[in-house]
């Protein structure tokens, strides 16, 4: 805001071995990195979260450059049973609600008593937040409490929603872990608030949102590695399979494909 880069960010970048830093942001930064300017070179890939304008800009430039995902708005789903502390659950829901009016805080539980207690706790805690207006809008517009008949039905609901952050706040989190199929990041147990994953635990917190955890993964080292396939056959090895290759190609009507193999063995 004052025209300077936060020194903590600069220190982290130096520790990570970053050699170039450009002081820019927003959709315009995405455009500059994708197409290049006089002062910013074009890049091959753009990663990381942002607001709705950044997400839309990344969608626009995809194809010109690679991207990791279209991320946001932020989501948290707390799967909780009746043994949970409702104040903790409410605090965890609000940790994402304060991000953005469009953020989605969701509680899925098999306990009606917990559902009521968490609802009451939200009303206590929201006014205490510096970003209370944002948290209030998020909870009112996008917040949900889903009451299920049992824990297994609750897990089914989680898998359908496929949340960005999933807190498994139940008595035996490892006992139900194998049932969980779709989530960006899974926080196991009552002592693992979402903020632990954001700031300290280690896994990247750029995560799939809007149900895309059904088919995509968090940002990770693979996003920064480009792979190629390698194929080598000897003459004898190719000759042994040449008729089968030609047969596949001819069945597709691609006779030049077949010819490129069989010509090597014509006398």
Question: What label would you give each PLM region?
Answer:
Residues 19-22, 43-47, 51-52, 68, ...:
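Structural motif
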């Amino acid at each position: 805001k004052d025209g300077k880069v936060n020194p903590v960010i600069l220190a982290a970048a130096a520790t990570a071995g970053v050699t170039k830093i450009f002081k820019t942001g927003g959709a315009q930064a995405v455009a500059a990195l994708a197409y290049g300017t006089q002062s910013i070179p074009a890049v091959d890939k753009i990663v990381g979260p942002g607001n709705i304008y950044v997400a839309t800009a990344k969608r626009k430039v995809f194809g010109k450059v690679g991207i990791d995902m279209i991320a946001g708005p932020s989501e948290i789903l707390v799967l909780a049973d009746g043994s949970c502390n409702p104040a903790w659950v409410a605090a965890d829901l609000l940790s994402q609600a304060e991000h953005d009016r469009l953020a989605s805080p969701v509680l899925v539980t098999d306990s009606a008593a917990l559902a009521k207690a968490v609802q009451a706790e939200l009303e206590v805690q929201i006014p205490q937040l510096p970003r209370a207006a944002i948290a209030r809008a998020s909870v009112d517009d996008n917040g949900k409490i889903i009451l299920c008949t049992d824990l297994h039905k609750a897990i089914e609901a989680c898998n359908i929603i496929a949340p960005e952050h999933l807190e498994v706040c139940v008595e035996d989190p490892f006992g139900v872990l194998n049932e969980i199929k779709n989530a960006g990041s899974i926080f196991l147990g009552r002592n693992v608030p979402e903020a632990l994953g954001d700031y300290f635990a280690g896994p990247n917190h750029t995560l799939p949102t809007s149900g895309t955890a059904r088919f995509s993964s968090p940002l990770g080292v693979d996003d920064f590695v480009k792979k190629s396939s390698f194929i080598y056959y000897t003459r004898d090895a190719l000759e042994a399979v040449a008729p089968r290759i030609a047969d596949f190609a001819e069945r597709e009507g691609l006779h030049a494909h077949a010819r490129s193999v069989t010509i090597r063995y014509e006398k």
